[in-house]
Regions:
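FMN-binding flavodoxin-like domain, especially the glycine-rich phosphate-binding loop
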Residues: 2-6, 10-40, 47-188
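Proline-rich low-complexity regions
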Residues: 62, 69, 137, 195, ...
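Charge-patterned, long linear interaction tracts outside catalytic cores
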Residues: 181-203
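Iron-sulfur cluster-binding cysteine motifs and their immediate structural context
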Residues: 197, 203-230
């Protein structure tokens, strides 16, 4: 391995923190360089990213409803190509369950020319509320992640043949996305939410905002009242 790449979609910064921590730790253990590629914003999802056989990619996304975010899945499927590249799929979740998110990401990476050698599902503070998994990852979580990265680095450095896909929890195949049902048992119909904010709040962070999730984290004083989803 000559380089480690941290690749991630991170609307609020949680996944970025986890993926870069793991990637940097692996790079330190292998004595190689580390680089990051953030495909959160649309302008970073326009060109094919190729990775070579001497690189290791730590690839992360959050889990939405137990899956890789459906709006990001096409980018994961088409924009990142490995050439026998080692990979570590990582998903973050808001303290309920990562369900099929990790195995789905593993399968997409394997399909795109990567060889997965380790995988992680990591609890992070929920994007909708600081009261759900507050402060996670905490100090103990980071210790566990550092140990995980050390073991991934050791495995990467000792491989003598192409590894089988890493075994992770989940259904394979993963099946269709979850469909919320209404009280009548039929698929629920959702209207687009338009947050009510103080003048200028969202405009002041529009270059940082990835939809409502990032807005919540950057503008809590203005858009988190009881009317923000009216």
């Amino acid at each position: 391995i000559t380089a480690v790449k941290a690749v991630y979609y991170s609307a609020t910064g949680n996944t970025e923190a986890v993926v870069t921590r793991i990637a940097k730790r692996i790079a330190e253990r292998l004595g190689v360089s580390v680089e990051s590629y953030d495909f959160t914003l649309p302008e970073n999802r326009t060109q094919l990213q190729n990775f070579g056989p001497s690189e290791l990619v730590v690839f992360g996304t959050p889990v939405y409803a137990g899956r890789v975010p459906n709006k990001m899945l096409p980018a994961v499927q088409t924009l990142f190509k490995g050439d026998g590249t080692l990979a570590v799929p990582v998903v973050t979740f808001g303290n309920r369950n990562f369900d099929n998110g990790l195995i789905e990401l593993r399968n997409e990476l394997e399909h795109n020319g990567f060889h997965t050698i380790a995988g992680a599902g990591v609890v992070c503070s929920h994007v909708f509320s600081d009261q759900i998994a507050p402060g996670r990852p905490d100090e103990e979580d980071w210790k566990i992640l550092d140990d995980f990265a050390d073991r991934a680095a050791e495995k990467a450095g000792s491989l003598t043949e192409i590894p089988a896909p890493i075994q992770v929890r989940g259904d394979d195949p993963v099946g269709p996305y979850y469909t919320p049902l209404g009280t009548d048992g039929k698929p629920a119909v959702f209207l687009k939410a338009k947050p009510l904010t103080k003048d200028g709040c969202l405009r002041s962070v529009r270059n940082l905002c990835q939809g409502l999730s990032h807005g919540l984290h950057k503008c809590r004083g203005s858009i988190t009242g009881h009317r923000y989803l009216h």
